[in-house]
Curated annotation (Swiss-Prot):
Span of domain Smr: 708-783
Organism placement in taxonomy: Bacteria, Bacillati, Bacillota, Bacilli, Lactobacillales
Segments traversing the membrane: none
EC number, as in UniProt: 3.1.-.-, 3.6.4.-
The keyword S-adenosyl-L-methionine belongs to this UniProt entry's keyword annotation: no
An annotated Gene Ontology molecular function: ATP binding
Gene behind this protein: mutS2
Positions contributing to ATP binding: 328-335
Species of origin: Streptococcus thermophilus (strain ATCC BAA-491 / LMD-9)
Protein name: Endonuclease MutS2
EC main group: hydrolase
Keyword terms of this UniProt record: ATP-binding, DNA-binding, Endonuclease, Hydrolase, Nuclease, Nucleotide-binding, RNA-binding, rRNA-binding
Subunit composition and interactions: Homodimer. Binds to stalled ribosomes, contacting rRNA.
InterPro entries: DNA_mismatch_repair_MutS_C, DNA_mismatch_repair_MutS_core, DNA_mismatch_repair_MutS_sf, MSSS, MutS, MutS2, P-loop_NTPase, Smr_dom
Length: 783
């Protein structure tokens, strides 16, 4: 798009309004480089980014990047094998820290569905090792002692020397205080000295480094500290050398990652820019417009972004409307209306929110042209007309059906009759070329053109004859009328004279009366529309209030539900503990076989609702603070991942435990099981509910479940359920299981086959007989 239109409509001033909402230099640079786009997909993507940022603010009450410098120049220097200075390293350190913070924010993000922003969040790369290395430089620009052992040693020696010097000088102060001009230790040329009275300069042996302007004080470095000061000077040089080496090493660590760090910096800046767009939208009560696909546009209550308290107006360009002609006298706001339309389009095509109401729709134009300028004096009329015509010629030679043309005072600056004819001919050319055009004129002849010509519509700016002031309201469909007679009458001109003037222009008076009636009807319609909008706003406020109350109720409901779930889980755990005790006693008395004990326990567990308390903060804290007792061989345990009971059989050298769980021997870490007697057993995570059906009844009691139905499951969910199902089957001594996966696309079926092929407790597997499901069901033999 041509850049001339940006200057004509003062688009850079609009962009400046976004500056106060941006925190990073990268976002400021992106704003400076922002120009209108012509690709609808790119524009829509930026609108989606703003919408998703709005949802983040609503759900999480904020989002911030922090103040970040532009690091493009330091990164360029790294690529040239240059070493960075401390301030440049601090700038990169802050970018890496902000990147890590943003990644954590995204990981903790809940209740927000992201599409456009998700792509940005997931492209951020973390550099924990680089962050750790850069911690050796604090934000004040100081290299910490721990940056290297050598630096730490140098600074330790410096402190020792400095302490020794101070102690020596303090001793001199005590003994020779009467010889000193001031009872303090001064510094000259980086060396510690004493301010000695000139009369005693020969009483203290040492080197004179300075004399006061009055000559009464001599700054002497006592001989006793000269050697120490020399050592400090050398240590300072060593310190500078070591710090330079550290900066070189840090630069070398960053060098291989310049591209990724640059990408992170761009994402942070772009995120900040999106945040700024949202804050502008929120503060200015702006909106994200819809995008039409047929060059129609509808702007509801659109406002000029650069005016203070602008009047809001509605404007539409339907598919069958090509030209809008705004007629009527000057100073009514016609030019402002032209600029308002142009700026709304430029802002929207730049991915910015516009000052309008919801339901507004913009078109996507490949070019926007304008001829807008203030009228010049009569003496300059020729140059004014020539200037306008030069612009018009350029526009007509370049514009096409994908363009928007804005012309102010078309045909002005020449003979009125010729100017009106020329204006009409130009508008007709634009109409026939199907170029969307809005033009202003004060020529009354164009009113008839707007009424009589297809795809052309008149418009005007409302004028309040009671106050004799323009209202700046845009009245589409109503041509402008002359208010000269009414103004003259209200200003006190003799009524006889006014009547005589009206009689001399009977035809024009009839037209004006018709226009006046149209204006009255339009004003009445606008009042009704405003009333409807007010009602809609009240309904919107009511809906928001109801939604807020609902959210508060839902929050309290969730808290009470979690509390109830905890109480229920405690009751269930107590019952399960009692059942464990009963079954153990029966087993000890050899009244049940081992596999019958496991089977009975499984049936008892089915009575317990599996309550998900994994998000219960109180329980998580209690779990962390529980008094742990060291496990021993022979202890009964609960395997956390499966909720199954087992027994510890031995402990390996690496600290892991061997456990017997049903038919399976497992190697477990200490945090992968809990002791049966520990209170924390009540806190085990909720097991994944497995979709199974019972085996055919072979005895009077229910048998263990041996069929898993994975139809309709997602891949990850299906694999989790399959893994848990096979473990449960092995623990219940099942020899054969059925897995129903259906045929479908074959993804789940292939995944089941791969899983069974790798499992060491699956002897063999095959598809079920055709009568029992065929290739939609797999039968696996366990052992």
């Amino acid at each position: 798009m041509n850049t001339k239109i940006l200057d004509q409509l003062e688009f850079n001033k609009v962009k400046d309004q976004f500056t106060e909402y941006l925190q990073t230099e990268q976002a400021q640079a992106e704003l400076r480089d922002l120009v209108p786009m012509t690709n609808p997909e790119r524009i829509q993507n930026q609108f989606t980014e703003i919408q998703e940022m709005s949802e983040i603010f609503i759900e999480h009450h904020g989002f911030a990047i922090g103040s970040l410098r532009d690091i493009s120049e330091p990164l360029r220097r790294l690529e040239l094998d240059a070493d960075l200075n401390i301030q440049e390293l601090i700038a990169i350190k802050k970018v890496l820290q902000a990147s890590a913070d943003l990644s954590r924010f995204y990981a903790d993000l809940e209740n927000v569905e992201l599409i456009a922003l998700k792509r940005l969040f997931e492209k951020i790369e973390a550099f924990p090792s680089l962050q750790g290395s850069l911690q050796s430089i604090n934000d004040g620009g100081f290299i910490e002692h721990f940056a290297s052992p050598e630096l730490q040693n140098i600074r330790r020696q410096l402190k020792a020397c400095d302490d020794a010097i101070r102690q020596t000088l303090q001793d001199i102060l005590k003994k020779s205080g009467h010889m000193l001009a001031e009872n303090l230790i001064a510094s000259r040329n980086g060396r510690s000295v004493l301010p000695v009275k000139n009369t005693y300069r020969n009483r203290i042996a040492g080197v004179v480094h300075d004399i006061s302007s009055s000559g009464n004080t001599v700054y002497i470095e006592p001989r006793a500290v000269i050697q120490l000061n020399e050592k400090i000077t050398q240590l300072r040089a060593d310190e500078r050398h070591e710090m330079a080496r550290i900066l070189h090493e840090l630069s070398d660590q960053l060098r291989p990652h310049t591209a990724a760090i640059a990408n992170n910096a761009w994402i942070l800046g772009h995120m900040d820019f999106i945040r700024g767009k949202y804050l502008y939208l929120h503060d200015k009560k702006a909106i994200i417009p819809e995008i039409s696909d047929n060059q129609t546009l509808q702007l509801l209550n659109v406002r000029h972004p650069l005016l203070i308290n602008p009047v809001a107006n509605d404007l539409r360009f339907d598919e069958d409307l090509t030209v809008i002609v705004i007629t009527g006298p000057n100073t009514g706001g016609k030019t402002v209306m032209l600029k308002t339309l142009g700026l709304a389009q430029l802002m929207a095509q730049s991915g910015l929110p516009i000052l309008a109401d919801k339901g507004s729709r913009v078109a996507i134009f490949q070019e926007i042209f304008a001829d807008i300028g203030d009228e010049q004096s009569i003496e300059q009329s020729l140059s004014t007309f020539s200037s306008h015509m030069t612009h018009i010629v350029e526009i007509l030679n370049t514009a096409d059906s994908n363009s928007l043309v804005l012309v102010d005072e078309l045909g002005a600056g020449t003979d009125p009759q010729e100017g009106a004819s020329l204006a009409m001919a130009i508008l007709e050319h634009l109409r026939l070329s199907q170029i969307k055009t809005m033009a202003t004129t004060h020529y009354p002849e164009l009113k008839a053109y707007g009424i009589e010509t297809q795809h052309v519509e008149n418009a005007s700016m409302e004028f309040d004859t009671a106050t004799l002031r323009p209202t700046y309201r845009f009245m589409q469909g109503v041509p402008g009328r002359s208010n000269a007679f009414e103004i003259a009458r209200r200003l006190g001109l003799n009524e006889i004279i006014v009547k005589e003037a009206e009689n001399l222009t009977d035809t024009d008076s009839d037209v004006n009366r018709i226009i006046e009636q149209l204006e009255a009807q339009t004003v009445e319609t606008q009042k009704r529309l405003e009333h409807i909008k007010d009602v809609e706003q009240e309904n919107l406020k009511f809906n928001r209030a109801v939604k807020k109350l609902y959210n508060e109720f839902s929050h309290e409901y969730d808290k009470e539900l979690e509390k109830a779930q905890k109480e229920i889980q405690e009751m269930v755990d107590t019952a399960l503990a009692e059942s464990d005790s009963i079954l153990k006693n029966l087993h000890d008395k050899s009244q049940l076989k081992p596999h019958e004990v496991i089977d009975a326990k499984g049936k008892l567990k089915k009575l317990a609702a599996q309550v998900d308390l994994s998000k219960n903060k109180v329980l998580r804290k209690a779990k962390k603070e529980k008094a742990a007792r060291a496990p021993r061989v022979g202890d009964d345990i609960i395997v956390t991942a499966y909720g199954q009971r087992g027994t510890l059989t031995s402990q390996a050298k690496n600290g892991n435990w061997e456990a017997q769980v049903g038919l399976i021997k497992m190697s477990l870490k200490a945090d992968e099981f809990t002791l049966v007697r520990a209170q924390a057993e009540a806190q085990q995570p909720k097991k994944k509910q497995i979709n199974v059906v019972k085996k055919a009844k072979k005895t009077s009691s229910d048998g263990p479940r041996a069929r898993l139905d994975l139809r309709g499951k997602r891949y990850e969910e299906a694999m989790q359920e399959l893994d848990a199902f096979i473990d449960q089957a092995l623990l219940n001594n099942m020899s054969q299981v059925e897995i129903i996966h259906g045929i479908g696309t074959g993804v789940i079926r292939d995944a089941v086959t791969k899983y069974l092929r790798r499992h060491r407790h699956v002897k063999n597997f095959e598809y079920a007989p055709q009568s029992a499901g065929g290739s939609g069901c797999t039968i696996a033999t366990l052992g």
